[in-house]
Every structure is written in structure tokens, then in C-alpha cells.
Amino acid sequence: MCGNPAVGNGTRALILVGGYGTRLRPLTLSTPKPLVEFANKPILLHQLEALVDAGCRQVILAVSYRAEQMEKELKVEAKKLGVELIFSHETEPLGTAGPLALAKTILAASSEPFFVLNSDVICDFPFKQLVQFHCNHGKEGTIVVTKVEEPSKYGVVLYDENGCIKNFIEKPQEFVSNKINAGIYIFNPSVLDRIEVKPTSIEKEVFPEMTQQQELYAMDLTGFWMDIGQPKDFLTGMCLYLSSLRQKQSPKLYTGPGVVGNVLVDPTAKIGEGCRIGPNVTIGPDVVIEDGVCIKRSTILKGAIVRSHSWLDSCIVGWRSTVGRWVRIEGITVLGEDVIVKDELYINGGQVLPHKSIAASVPEPQIIM
């Protein structure tokens, strides 16, 4: 790979899929988080497509939770993409580094560098640039860093003008940097000698040692980035993704009567008359939107129905859920799978578990079980 900047067929990647997806409940009570649709496509499929586009032919999924469902659904997609998917099963949670050691025989089978990424990340994936940057500096690892508005919420990365990382500072109270770890890495196989098959944090246990030895570099990400592991960030990420689509692939966006701004609609969805859809809306397969509905900054998942004259803002409507007539939903409300909201109700910030029927308004954010 480093001999050939055009990323060869020897490229491999490991995606950290492990966790239970608790931050994205109630959606993840029905579906493993990597299979939840983001902009009408499973989160993980965005990453797989970007890896394949960069020449990757083998992807290891480090899984622990509901692996069978993922295998079943992803094998079909992998075949279409022409990528070999290997499932590496954790019997106990191994953190962010342990899964690399568990997959060591596969990752060390070639001397070429390999990608590692966190399954919650959506961005303009820079895999080709990352390979070139990594090969140019010739050290053991490179992490992608991205600029954020509020660095005090994160651990920040300090590095010199060449990209050589000098330090990591966890949630700084005073401004030292606004660059954070974006959860996308490339490593030489020699990094595997630093990791054992046990619960290990790559950020807290492996990176500091590599930094001390000047073996870890940072590459700046251009374009948008979001960790979409929780509903608020899922919706923000959707807005950023649709904006990127507008710049790069605008024909994919929906244009029709009543559409405002960036909207993505599956061809099988039906939208009634007198609706106002957008900005920043995704509507999935087999969705029915009746007449006079207003939707903005929301995701409507497969098979959901929104009855006439309802108003939705900043919400996620789960698979096969039904929103009644003259309903108002806002405040980062998430309806799980197969939820029924009766007519003329108000829901503000509700997290509604699957298969529930809501017959009274929910004026304050709460979990409805």
C-alpha cells in the first residue's frame, strides 16, 4: 500500500462495532446500532462503501452484541460491494484496543498498514489521503483529528506542524486546542505487539506510549464529522451529511412541491398534498406522509405513517410507527419501533419504547415504557 499510493487490494480494515448502543435507545432495542438507518442507509454501510471506494477488500467487524443479526443482514450488502466481511466475536467487552489483538492473525497476515474505525462516526471519510499521509511520515500510526466548537467536552490532541503528536489532554478547562480524535486510524501491523487480548483502551493505554516514542501522527480532516451515537448528534449529523450531499451529489436530494432545503426521500415513500417537508429531513422506504403534514430536521424510518396535519420537528420516528392526525412532536423525541401516537397529542422530548401506544400528551422530556 505504501509503495502504491492508489491503495491496493491488500488493504484491510477493522470496525469497532462492539457496544450495546444504549445512547441511541429506544431504536437499538429493536436493531443493533450499526444497522440503524442514517440517511436511509445502515450506519455501517456508509463506512463499508467508503472503505471499498478506497480499495479495501477485507473488513473485520469486531462484534459482541447481536452478531447473528448483523451477519445475516450485512452479508448481502458485502456481496454487492465485493468486500469480504470477517466477524471477530468478543466473548467479553475488550474496549477499543483488545479487538485488534483478537484479530491479530488476520491483521498481521500482511505487512501493509490497516484502518481502524469507530462504528459511530459519519464524515467525509478520507481513507485515500490517510494512506498517503501515513506512508509519507513512515511512523507506526496516524489518527484523524477534527475541529470542534466545544473542545472542553472532549479529549484534545496537541501536535506539531508536521503532525507529530505531542500530547493528549482530557476535557481541558482552558483552551489549548480545538482538535479532537475523530475515531479513524491507520496503523502498521507492528502496533499489534503493543496490545494483548484483554479489555484495553487504545486512547488511554496505547496512544500515550506511541506518543512518547514519537510513533503517532495526526492528520486534519477536511469536511464534516459527527459521532452519531445519540439522538441529538444523530440529527445534527444528518444535517451535515445532507449539506455535504448538496455539494457533492445534489441529484440524490428530493425536489418536489412543498420541499424546503435538503431532503432525502426513498422512491417508495408516498407524500400527500399540501405538505411542507424540510429543511433537513430523511424519509425512508414505504413511509406514508398524509396531506398537510409539516416535517423539519427529522428522520422518518421505514414503514412509518404520519397522518394528516401533524407537525414534526427534531425527532426520529421509528420503523412502522404511526403518528396520528393533528399531532405535534418536537424536542428530540424518539419513537421506537411500532409505536402508535393517537390523534391531537403533543410530545416534547419523549423517548418512547417499542410497541407502545401513546394516548396522552407528553409535555416534558421523559422515557415512556
UniProtKB/Swiss-Prot annotation:
Q: In which pathway does it act?
A: Nucleotide-sugar biosynthesis; GDP-alpha-D-mannose biosynthesis; GDP-alpha-D-mannose from alpha-D-mannose 1-phosphate (GTP route): step 1/1
Q: What is the scientific name of the source organism?
A: Drosophila melanogaster (Fruit fly)
| Subunit and interaction comment | Component of the GMPPA-GMPPB mannose-1-phosphate guanylyltransferase complex composed of 4 Gmppa subunits and 8 Gmppb subunits; the complex is organized into three layers, a central layer made up of 2 Gmppa dimers sandwiched between two layers each made up of 2 Gmppb dimers. Gmppb catalytic activity is reduced when part of the complex and binding of GDP-alpha-D-Mannose by Gmppa induces allosteric feedback inhibition of Gmppb.
Domain text: The N-terminal substrate-binding domain adopts a Rossman-like fold and has a binding pocket for GTP or GDP-alpha-D-mannose. Substrate binding is coordinated by an Mg(2+) ion.
What cellular component terms from Gene Ontology apply here? cytoplasm; GDP-mannose pyrophosphorylase complex
Keywords attached to this entry? GTP-binding, Magnesium, Metal-binding, Nucleotide-binding, Nucleotidyltransferase, Transferase
Q: What is this protein called?
A: Mannose-1-phosphate guanylyltransferase catalytic subunit beta
Q: Coding gene?
A: Gmppb
Q: Which family does it belong to?
A: Belongs to the transferase hexapeptide repeat family.
GO molecular function terms listed in the Swiss-Prot or TrEMBL record: GTP binding; mannose-1-phosphate guanylyltransferase (GTP) activity; metal ion binding
